[in-house]
From Swiss-Prot:
One GO cellular component term noted in the UniProt record for this chain: cytosolic ribosome
UniProt key word GTP-binding: no
Originating gene: RpL13A
Pfam families named among the record's database cross-references: Ribosomal_L13 (PF00572)
MF term (GO), any: mRNA binding
PROSITE patterns recorded: RIBOSOMAL_L13 (PS00783)
A biological process term (GO) from this entry: cytoplasmic translation
Official protein name in the record: Large ribosomal subunit protein uL13
PANTHER family the record matches: LARGE RIBOSOMAL SUBUNIT PROTEIN UL13, RIBOSOMAL PROTEIN L13
Record key words, sorted: Ribonucleoprotein, Ribosomal protein
Family: Belongs to the universal ribosomal protein uL13 family.
UniProt entry tagged with the keyword Ribosomal protein: yes
Length: 205
């Protein structure tokens, strides 16, 4: 993530450990970068699922005893869980921290326009590279679903539609590429004298 630009870095959350990814994202935001994290429901948590569920249910019980409507408010959506993890690593009560958080976007699934953008991964936060193969882990999406998040089926449906649309697009692009190669072969002999002239001026054909 070196070389800051105004362009938003789109990170695919699938297969990343939540805390490790949050620390990398928090540091990048404080350096002035813009980040969008998609597919937060496929982030991973190390440890057995039931252990993580018990911890999260204990976290949900932390509320104002006099009037629970005062807060604190505990979000169930995977994207908001990740957002809060990042927020905890940033001085969010200062102007600098607020500006950093304003540069963060988090999403469940891959909404438009990020479905057409190049997505990257963070190797130092990926589960397959950082967690021992015999260690237990669980998905944030499953945890969220079991503690009150109601949109797991909606996100899965939207993801199926997106992947079906992507398969059609890729098939069309492959066919177009074949036609382009065939067209070049068909005109190769006729275009040879023109290519020589272009090359004489120092251009590559």
């Amino acid at each position: 993530m070196t070389g800051l630009t105004n362009r938003t870095v789109v990170i695919d959350g699938r297969g990343h450990l939540l805390g490790r990814l949050a620390s990398v994202v928090a540091k990048y935001l404080l350096q002035g970068g813009k980040v969008a994290v998609v597919r937060c429901e496929e982030l991973n948590l190390s440890g057995h699922f039931y252990r993580n569920k018990i911890k999260f249910l204990a976290y949900l019980r932390k509320r104002c005893n006099v009037n629970p409507a005062r807060g604190p408010f505990h979000f169930r959506a995977p994207s908001r869980i990740f957002y809060k993890a990042v927020r905890g690593m940033i001085p969010h009560k200062t102007k600098r921290g607020q500006a950093a958080l304003a540069r963060l976007r988090v999403f469940d699934g891959i909404p438009s326009p990020y479905d057409k953008r190049r997505r990257v991964v963070v190797p130092i936060a990926m589960r397959v590279l950082t967690l021992r193969s015999d260690r237990k882990y669980c998905q944030v999406g499953r945890l969220s679903h079991e503690v009150g998040w109601h949109y797991q089926d909606v996100i899965k449906s939207l993801e199926r539609k997106r992947k079906a649309k992507l398969r059609v697009t890729l098939k069309h692009n492959r066919e177009l590429k074949k036609l382009t190669v065939k067209a070049r072969e068909n005109i190769a002999k006729a275009a040879e004298p023109f290519n020589k002239i272009i090359k004489s001026y120092g251009y590559e054909v």
